[in-house]
Amino acid sequence: MMTARALVRQINELLSFLLEEGLAIDWNSAIIRDSGHDSILTWANAPDRLFDALVGRFATITEYRNLIENRHYHCMLFDGSIIQFGYLYTNNTLSKHRNCYYPCPLVITSSDIESIQTGHDFVTLFDLLLTQEIDALRAAISESEFSRLQNLLRLSTPFRFDFDPGSQTDTHPASHLHLLNEECRWPVFGPISIGHFVRFIFRHFYPKIWSKYDVLRNWGLQFHTRSITDQERGELFVECNDFSQRP
């Protein structure tokens, strides 16, 4: 089983790769915060209560803007989407994780990105583009030209994979996927590794990048103890099997 410190090295290797290839425009190093028997894998400027602070207002422009304003992410990709990793180890055993891919709610072009100096300036760019888009939408609606507008606002949901066996109930799977709203908890086979998450993001949302880089396609998967229950297997759920362990 991979340790918290091994995960830190893996995440920082990923961040270095994304920066070197121009796929990320801002980043925060992965670090570990130790507290008693707990080790929390987080980022350098993350809130102290990582697993509580990021709950609420899920899948809203307000939440996204708060995250980019406070740089609450491990990295921001070239299109303004952000990636967060969070793992909690208790007595060297994985007890929680929260991995989130948060797409930018606006279409951000490469020329937009070239107009700013650093990721710190992205909030100003986002506010400007959002204001322009709202003004354009307002004018289009009043002039009955809405259907002709080149809409930059996107109906894109974040994807957040949570693992929290301490909160497991019949309606709260130990491992689950949030999308669209906080109350949607789609059962997942078990805790997901960095490899599962990286492959999920780039394979499904950046297919050209996925096809170009062997590093992403070959990123290893680690499997922890499955947490899916018989009841959850009777519903639609997210599955993945470790075929390498089969005879």
Where are these regions (language model features)?
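N-terminal "first-domain core" detector
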Residues: M1-F78, I82-I83
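Histidine (H) residue identity feature
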Residues: H37, H72-H74, H97, H120, ...
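Short, well-structured alpha-helical interface segments that form or flank functional binding sites
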Residues: N70, G80, L94-K96, S156, ...
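Long, compositionally biased interface segments
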Residues: C184-P247
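Generic structural hydrophobic/aromatic packing signal, biased to beta-strands
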Residues: C75, I83-F85, P158-F163, H176, ...
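An exposed acidic His-Trp-rich patch
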Residues: T90-I192
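Amphipathic alpha-helical interface segments
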Residues: L41-A44, R49, F85-S95, P105
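Short secondary-structure capping micro-motifs at structural edges
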Residues: N70-Y73, S81-Y89, S144-L149
